[in-house]
UniProtKB/Swiss-Prot annotation:
GO function terms (MF aspect): rRNA binding; structural constituent of ribosome
Stored Gene3D superfamilies: 6.10.160.10, Ribosomal protein L20
Entry keywords, A to Z: Ribonucleoprotein, Ribosomal protein, RNA-binding, rRNA-binding
HAMAP family: Ribosomal_bL20 (MF_00382)
Protein name in UniProt: Large ribosomal subunit protein bL20
Domain of life: Bacteria
Coiled-coil stretches noted in the UniProt entry, renumbered to this chain: none
PANTHER family xrefs: 39S RIBOSOMAL PROTEIN L20
Keyword Manganese: no
GO BP annotations listed: ribosomal large subunit assembly; translation
Function, as annotated: Binds directly to 23S ribosomal RNA and is necessary for the in vitro assembly process of the 50S ribosomal subunit. It is not involved in the protein synthesizing functions of that subunit.
Record-level GO cellular component terms: ribonucleoprotein complex; ribosome
Family: Belongs to the bacterial ribosomal protein bL20 family.
Length: 119
């Protein structure tokens, strides 16, 4: 009988890689070597984008809050400062959601911020 080097171990390792590469285009999902190289690149993108996701969402929330505040004659920075002075402790995610879904409630927050800034 011929000698078998890492027979079942290699098969399992290759199957695991090819399973993770499902959905990739062409040989990148069929051939082990191409799949492995693509997965290495995918891992770097995953690592980078887990961090970028936080930045991107914060930027989106700030844009939504700014748009809502400008509808009521205020810009983002004065609105946030007014909320801080008034002691309103809502994060940007919640503020953006209120601005998008509940304009009446956001109007109350804007009035609170204006009142706190004016003294």
């Amino acid at each position: 009988m011929p000698r078998v080097k890492t027979g079942i171990v290699r098969r399992r390792r290759h199957k695991k890689v090819l399973k993770r590469a499902k959905g990739f285009w062409g040989s990148r999902s069929k051939q082990y070597r191409n799949a492995f190289q693509t997965l290495l690149n995918a891992a770097t993108y995953e690592y980078r984008d887990r961090r970028n996701k936080k930045r991107d969402f914060r930027r989106l929330w700030i844009q939504r809050i700014n748009a809502g505040a400008r509808l009521h004659g205020m810009n983002y920075s004065t609105f946030i400062n007014g909320l801080k002075v008034a002691g309103v402790d809502l994060n940007r995610k919640v503020l953006a959601d209120i601005a998008a879904r509940e304009p009446e409630a956001f109007q109350v927050l804007v009035n609170t911020a204006k009142g706190a800034r004016n003294g």
